[in-house]
Amino acid sequence: NLLQFNKMIKIMTKKNAIPFYSS
């Protein structure tokens, strides 16, 4: 699910404070 994936990405990026993806 793309929505779930986006949610996970947001949480991870917030945790790491580093966007490891570009789109």
Curated annotation (Swiss-Prot):
Binds 1 Ca(2+) ion. GO terms for biological process: lipid catabolic process. It catalyses: a 1,2-diacyl-sn-glycero-3-phosphocholine + H2O = a 1-acyl-sn-glycero-3-phosphocholine + a fatty acid + H(+). The keyword Calcium applies. Keywords: Calcium, Disulfide bond, Hydrolase, Lipid degradation, Lipid metabolism, Metal-binding, Neurotoxin, Presynaptic neurotoxin, Secreted, Toxin. Its EC number is 3.1.1.4. Negative results: does not show myotoxic activities. Belongs to the phospholipase A2 family. Group II subfamily. Snake venom phospholipase A2 (PLA2) that displays presynaptic neurotoxicity. PLA2 catalyzes the calcium-dependent hydrolysis of the 2-acyl groups in 3-sn-phosphoglycerides. This is Basic phospholipase A2 mangshantoxin.
